[in-house]
Amino acid sequence: MKIALCSSFVPFVNGGARNIVEWLEIELKRAGHQVERVYLPQVDAPDLLMPQMMAYRWVDLTKLSDRIICFRPPAHLIPHPNKILWFIHHVRVFYDLWDSEYRSFPDDAKHRSFRAALHRVDTSAINEAKKVFTNSKVVSDRLTKYNGIGSELLYPPIAMPERFSSAGFNDEIVYVSRVEHHKRQHLLLQALKYTKSPVKLRFCGKAFNVSYANELRTVVAKHSLNSRVSFDDRWISEEEKIKVLSECLAVAYLPIDEDSYGYPSLEASHSGKPILSTRDSGGVVELVTDGYNGLLVEPTPQSLADAMDRLYLDRAVTMQMGKNATARIKELNISWSHVIDRLLS
């Protein structure tokens, strides 16, 4: 079968939205299909919204592919008689983040009209799909709430999970992610001030917002935490990441209302490490069961500090939660064989 994988991307920004496409391409080719990736750029600037949507609508793959699978918006606008969606999120500033601090434009007549138009167009285009899958219950719930559309949950695996394993438990809680305000690395730093154990933090990831990165370093200096906090202000290699995860105490991932459980959480699970997250972290809560394969706490410094101490001081429980984290993947049937079966059914 000739399959086109259609998605959008933000230039010079790598992350899960690209991984899900590229990793699926590998698995589909392994299954004997012809696969082509189709990308167009997209940014959340309101004045570019409609032109970008039109560009996707004009893409015609009808005679070139037997099926298209669409991921990141507005790729779902591409018309095709055999269109499948693996929908990973909306343009969130016009949906669930409209009333949040992350909307950078005014709530005025102009932008409300953009929002209303986007909702109408999205609903129409999504309804064109033969099947609609999502990467989390969170996203499925948003589709129901905002577009009145039902969907099937299909959790995304990672590439070559057999690369990851546990090599023991050191004193570091590791956070592998882009360094951004909504990923809330600052919460962990604030929590470290209240810990009673000598637990350490390690942040691995690039900061695109320089001011936020500087704020984090200021907190470290102000509270004399230099000996307990390390920053890898870059994208560490896959080999480095595998080693860091294999040796760490636990993995932290606490974004605000995340679209899915996030690849850092899944990589932690394959590495046999418990996940530290918060109850408002969206899709992460679908993967983590508190006290079983990680700890879910309130998004406050003191609650996180208590959890960090627990991970450090009760190593037997920490190790058992790590074993359970690996088992949790099988419990949720997170595998490429399941993904291929559902997307091509």
Regions inferred by a protein language model and the residue ranges of each:
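A short, well-ordered alpha-helix in the C-terminal region of glycosyltransferases
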Residues: 303, 310, 317-332, 338
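Membrane-proximal helix-turn-helix segments that form the acceptor-binding/catalytic region
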Residues: 103, 108-132, 140
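Short hydrophobic beta-strand element within catalytic cores of glycosyltransferases
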Residues: 270, 274-278
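Acidic donor-binding loop of glycosyltransferase active sites
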Residues: 245-260
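A conserved mid-protein helix/loop that constitutes part of the nucleotide-sugar donor-binding site
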Residues: 19, 171, 180-194, 214
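Conserved acidic donor-binding segment of nucleotide-sugar-dependent glycosyltransferases
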Residues: 290-291, 295-301, 310-315
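Short alpha-helical segment that forms part of, or immediately flanks, the ligand-binding pocket
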Residues: 242, 265-270, 285-286, 292
